[in-house]
Amino acid sequence: MRRWNGWGDEATVVELPAHGAAFLENLVGTGQRLKDATLEQVLMQVPESRLSLRHPLISVDAEVRVRHARGQSLPDWLAMRSGEFGVFPDAVALPETAAQIRELLAWAKGQDAIVIPYGGGTSVAGHINPVESAKPVLTLSLERMTQLLDLDEQSQIATFGPGANGPQVEAQLRARGYTLGHFPQSWELSTLGGWVASRSSGQQSLRYGRIEQLFAGGKVETFAGTLDIPTFPASAAGPDLRELILGSEGRFGVISEVKVRVTKLAEQEKFFAVFLPSWQQALAGIRALVQARIPLSMLRLSNAIETETQLALAGHPEQIALLEKYLALRGARAGKCMLTFGVTGNRSQNALSVKQAKKLLKSFGGVFTGTLLGKKWAENRFRFPYLRHGLWEAGYAVDTLETATDWNNVDHLLNQVEASLRQGLADEGERVHVFTHLSHVYGQGSSIYTTYVFRPGDRYETTLARWTKLKRAASQTIAANRGTISHQHGVGRDHAPYLVAEKGELGMAALKAMAQHFDPESRLAPGVLLED
């Protein structure tokens, strides 16, 4: 069963190993555990619904409302763990068809209600949280719209309901010999409609593309009517309407159907790990790889601190010690950086790609360790979000943030973001452990994905204040140093204040005009993407 106050399935537990706890204690200090609220305590706080008129497609059940009240950001985690949710949706709608979505939008308008589209509930930027409002709030969950509706094998276009999560998408496609190839870290829970709405990026985007390359068309239900976006392989017929929906985050309408470009399942897939002696050699190596257009399916480069942290938290200290000895003998010592890469395709193509990658990385001092660490990465690729629970139990808070920039700015921006976080709680005498990886690389530049660990305060309010201070410092640094405010998490409410630095006043006015066109009364996700 899915956790009501954290990530994923209750049966999946990722604990912090003892030597990992000692590693963090040395870097950050002794952990401080805060007391968690129980579900029963939270249920007692859920008020009566303000939606007096009932509808057969909505639920006002208290637990259903609790389970749809928050996403997965650290503030959401603190709210769920403390039991201080603040605001709950007045009801949760559960449509099964596009016609029912249209019916619910009309019903919500008649009730003068706000509508929050809800996919998998994995937002880490405040997309789905109800806020204080004089109007009742209807959360519209798409969790029952999960079916593969059509597969055009000639055109390789699949049509899905928007609520299909990653496993549901892949299971239905793989049964027919296809894959979407979109694997964000939230893959187990996040949905196809949510990926489109937030411009998601999957771990193997180097082969399959980001969601904007995969999204071929679909339908969106708006307060102004149904927007039907047909599929074309390419078109010069004016602006691309797909781009109106990609990244719209529910402000323009509710996605009711998604058409995506799919690929035949590959004959073979392998992942490898390489260690490079220094960050500068590693950075130059990964840039050379992607700009050489060697057909790899994924690249992930951890900086030296992330490499050290991953090895410390991996478990099996004896095996790690042997690995460290092997790497040191071959020139990858302190300051080394781990690069994981994958190949996906037919065997001959993969063999050539691996040969080319090895030759290129060897020129940057790369030390190859085969497929063992690559296999471990693939096996555990969706388990990192579960580690938040293990860290919390040990008395630590963890969060992530991300951006992207051109290659000539990657090193500078990464260092500035890390410094803003590392120094962010200095006025409280608190240390912050910060580390980064590059996981989506392009010929032009790269994403920058940073994780930070700090100690909670003595109260939940203090802990939230610490997060707010860190998040603001990093976001301001990103906006001031040529970074996008989001590469893959989206804008939501948390990043909305920084969007103008990227879009400009004229661009923001255009976005607001489009929102007004599709949603004249501003009922859909107010405050998300665009500050109201």
What are these regions (language model features)?
Residues 491-532:
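Activity-critical C-terminal alpha-helical subdomain
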